[in-house]
Structure formats: C-alpha cells, structure tokens
C-alpha cells in the first residue's frame, strides 16, 4: 500500500534529479563474471543501458543520453594535494578546490611493494605485510582515525584478521565514512 502511494506521488513529479559522479570508481566486476554476463547480454540482446556491469548512473546516461548534466565543481572534503591529483587525472582541472593546505607533511604517499606476482584471488598477503609492518608503524598514530580501503572483499577479510584495530572495508562500503588517514590496498599487481 505504501509503495502504491510512493509510485503515485513520484508520477506526479515534473522533474527528477539524480545525483552522482561518472568519474567515481565503477562497479567491481571480475573478468570472469564480465565474460559470462556478456554472453547472457548478447544472447538476450540486452542493451548497454540495462547491463548490471554498469553503475546505476552510467545506465541512466546510456538510456537517456541527452539528459542535462551538471558538474558540482566545488570540492570541500579532501586535502588540496589529494584532490588536485584527482582533479588533474580525472576531471581535466575542472574542480574548484575549496580546502586549504596547512603545510602538513606526507599528505599523499605511494608505497610500491617488491615486484612480483603477489595477487591471488583478489588477495595480496604481500600488501598486508607492508601495511602492517611498514606503513602503520611509520604513518599511523591514531588507529581509530585510520581506515584501509580495497576493491576486494577477500582482501578486506584478510586485513581484518591481521589488523584488528583499524577499520578495513571495500571502497564501496567505506564510501561516506570520514577518517583522517586512509590506506589504499590496490591488491592487483598492475
């Protein structure tokens, strides 16, 4: 009954707004699943806009390609050095960075692990060891204000077993949480 009321109310609305960011990370779909899904999509002639391997926002844009899009340019969350990387890499310099640099050290660091094929089944013990033995001792003074994000559930499970005092989650589950420090475990070698 309440669903009928909602759909009736929604049908009376003249305009709808969908808020999202096409530059954010897409759904994590493995190559194996993509291949199986493509076979199904091809077999049943499922158009691009209705394929679940797309994000919801990308599906909307595929189904309604002429819809008006507005970039929300002002960015208030990340340190300027962090968002400037994203601004140059993904947004063609279109964002207006509204935060200020207060001279903090080590705002953005990259730690490369030893070369080699360490990733197996979306899990990398080598990266966990580096995070636990090198990154946390050097950079983390307050575990409660630190989070570890990774694209893969298997890596989250392994991280959570070995590093119990720091929250670890997939990129999508961590989205919207606020932590002073974020460690990113990419897992994949390339």
Located regions from the model:
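Conserved helicase motor core of SF1/SF2 NTP-dependent helicases
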Residues: 7-190
């Amino acid at each position: 009954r309440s669903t009928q009321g909602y759909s009736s109310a929604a049908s009376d609305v003249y305009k709808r707004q969908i808020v999202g960011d096409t530059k954010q990370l897409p759904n994590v779909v493995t190559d194996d699943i993509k291949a199986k899904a493509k076979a199904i999509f091809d077999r049943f002639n499922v158009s691009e806009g209705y394929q679940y391997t797309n994000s919801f926002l990308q599906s909307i844009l595929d189904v309604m390609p002429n819809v008006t899009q507005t970039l929300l340019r002002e960015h208030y969350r990340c340190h300027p050095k962090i968002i400037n990387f994203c601004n140059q890499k993904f947004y063609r310099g279109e964002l207006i960075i509204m935060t200020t640099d207060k001279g903090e050290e080590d705002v953005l660091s990259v730690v490369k692990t030893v070369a080699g094929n360490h990733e197996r089944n979306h899990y990398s013990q080598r990266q966990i060891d580096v995070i636990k033995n090198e990154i946390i001792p050097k950079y983390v003074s307050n575990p409660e204000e630190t989070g570890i994000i990774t694209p893969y559930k298997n890596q989250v499970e392994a991280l959570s077993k070995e590093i119990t005092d720091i929250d670890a989650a997939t990129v999508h589950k961590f989205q919207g949480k606020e932590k002073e420090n974020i460690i990113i475990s990419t897992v994949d070698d390339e």
